[in-house]
Amino acid sequence: MYHGWTDPQVSPMLSVTYYDNVLKAVGKEKAANSIALFMMPGMNHCQGGDGPDTFDKVKVLEQWVEQGKKPAQIIASHMTNGQVDKTRPLCPYPQVAKYKGTGSMNDAANFSCVADAR
């Protein structure tokens, strides 16, 4: 699953609540084999917005289902005028992408997925 944090049409918290309810219903360990949630900072409803909104969804699913490689992160990109101007890791909820403190803030390589400090 993925959902944009700035979705103006469907509250992002609906996806968070659904995901949390699945974990409660079947247990974290069992659910981990079949569900993951990636929240996308700055993405509107399915696409658009200031944040990275583009990644190969089919490839991610194929690697997980067919090869058993559950994504630890997904690299998404943002484009302006047909050019990639930003990449960012999408982290499995509840992790978030944290800037490492050096390098371009528009380069996914300068971020790591960490537990949300809230």
Describe these PLM feature segments:
Residues 1-118:
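C-terminal His-loop and adjacent cap/lid subdomain of alpha/beta-hydrolase
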